[in-house]
Amino acid sequence: SMCGGFPHIPNKFKYKFSWSPLGVLRALNTPCKFIKNYKEETSDKAFRQISKMNFNGEEFEIYPNRDSTPYLKEYLSKEYIDKVKNFQRGTIRLKGWSKEWNKIFLKLDENSNLEKISSELWDKNKYQTNEKDRILLFVRFFAKYQNKIVYDKTLYIDESRNIENSAMSQCVSLTMVSVIECLIKNNTNPGISRIFNEINRVDFI
């Protein structure tokens, strides 16, 4: 399960900001955990686990987002969890992103002042009013039995918008609107609960 936002037309830095870069920096500086070859893999910083990904004929870079393992039970029944070979929730970036960000990674390694780095990045790489952003979000399930593919399905969103009505903001806000409508029309009980834990909510969305 991967998601990322980036410029519709790639810039040299391979990234632009529509709000404070501090959140991106903190996420990169955070430990991560995921499943690889049936085992839990960990890293003290997410940017140490960058890998390549091809999607619809386009090459991207990806890295894990914090701890993926608690989400296994959201995707799979309990009896299948121990049989999972690879499982990762992560962030998508444009091809060449890690090369352009190498100096930033070195500063993160040195525990430099994140607020200062954030301010510098914002000044140099924020979206301008005439630019477009792009989001790519996808979930892929891939299964084999006796070395044969028995299931392979991908659901995705690939959207670009003018930054004043950005694809990122639309993705977040439209999801929130759908959730609110679901709560109102399905007479949900008061309290905190996950929106997709009840079949009537899933069907509605």
Features from the language model and the residues they span:
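C-terminal catalytic/substrate-binding lobe primarily of soluble NAD(P)-dependent oxidoreductases
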Residues: 1-205
